[in-house]
């Protein structure tokens, strides 16, 4: 779904349902080798190249913009006059793999086709338009794959009625097939009020007209049909909704659930008096993303992917204003909560008493029957003991039927802790917003059943050319290690301090200081310096006398520093730890200097770039090739000949796939900088080295925030060696006694287990 799972296309197309005979008819990639070409694969049968000589070009192929290959890959020429229409179509049916300036690569997957049908595209429409745009005749295998992936979509719906979940279908035989699965059968409640002959509750619902081929490219909404259809349904346990949706995906039972909210005909939940203000004018790509979400008078659950700074907030507020029901908005931190509350008031007519914030510092409630609650994932997912006031608010959240669940930075939802919010809160429609649909722990595909399919994804370079986001110059600055630092870096006993050594490299410090001076004094820019390593963050900020924000910084102090950075001419540089990666809106910043990072995280690299992507200046100056070719700068400082070089290359992959290129700079600071910069003399460098080596291992590590397996996926398990000296406080640690709570005062310790009752595998340990 995101770059985390799509990365590069599979060599063979993968299919979903096991019992669909169409799946078995699709040929293997064997047909696309030249039998005479012995070099087409290596000794293990791995494919090296393919023979596409069997593809027949159409006579007017020069006027058609794309190539369709039998393995599911599609290549689009961006210089074609039909590029815009072809892009809008491809982004609806396929996953983007790589989108450089001249040629895009896409990949058809079961999930991408599931998303296509969910926004109203019929199977025959997809095949017909692909054939019209393709330079060659569509391969038979691709046609069969499209049929197989879309055959069952729309046959099953997940419906929320009066805080109860029902699986609904006009086909009772489909429900029987679902109930033959153990997971779904266990999740069923058997308390339906009215049963048909098959044991399902029977009701009636309005049908709807399907889209024709002529309605595809002009985005026409589908008209609702008047006839009624008989539907069959059964109720499922709300706690099992996630598991049931997962079992219905294309890679399992292949009956993807349709989640639509007929909000205009919802007379049960109270309406929210909320409209967009006249000055809220969504841009063309924002309108397009909303048109994918709303169709046929209904709201679809799913994900919208827009670059940082491209106006995701306006999309979210517009969706809430269109549904006009109670909305629960989830953000990643308290600063982001304040910003979202501000965005709702900025773009909509919502009154102050209709919107409230729920954080550790602010526990508000809206007045009336409907309103907007803005809170964090942590506040909702927290499983520990709460204050009485917080418990009441959470209970209200659980008992309310939310019209819209709006999730910012939705890529964090697959984390074990955050995905709880999906089961805790009940909502008719879920909208996820993100700039980076990518994770390193391969959980990004979980969003298909946690939230829904990807509805729309914008192309970064198109928005740059349109002047909607900043035109960024990306550069990788190579900083040679000093010989003293490199000697310590190579020692085996310093394995835990390797990162601190290459981050505190004096040449890197000097390059950072030079860039700050250049952009502050000669260009008057606003600069953000990112460092994941807290030891380095503190040393850099203290030495250069700049404000810093990290995990332990209070909310009040964060707000004060950010406000000074935005408004004061005296505060032009701020140091941020990883807390600044997500959901902090700093539109004034136009320079980023990254001195340390979280291993090879592609998502973090893109999120940090996004801090400076908001458009700057007048529109005519923002257009690519306007007054300034580049109006924002992203520097990644890397110590050469260290592990950081490998991580840097891996981190850049997502941005390269979006069409960005990295310039390599090897001569910073310039030779004439001399003693004007810090750590010029060897004595200063040795003093810094001593400070790094004398710091405890716990002080030179990465900042630890809320647990997310995406970050853990980049780390290896480590074994630490201790000594009795740490107990005396020689490394900043002290010995403390405490009661864990398991044995209260006056209670006796539990007797050890009888050795004869131990399992055979463990008996020998107690001999």
Curated annotation (Swiss-Prot):
Protein name as it appears in the record: General transcription and DNA repair factor IIH helicase/translocase subunit XPB1
Record gene name: XPB1
Residues of the Helicase C-terminal domain: 510-676
SMART domains named among the record's database cross-references: DEXDc, HELICc
Family of the protein in this entry: Belongs to the helicase family. RAD25/XPB subfamily.
Region of interest called Disordered, as start-end residue ranges on this chain: 1-51, 742-767
Record's keyword terms, sorted: ATP-binding, DNA damage, DNA repair, DNA-binding, Helicase, Hydrolase, Isomerase, Nucleotide-binding, Nucleus, Transcription, Transcription regulation
Any one GO MF annotation of this record: ATP hydrolysis activity
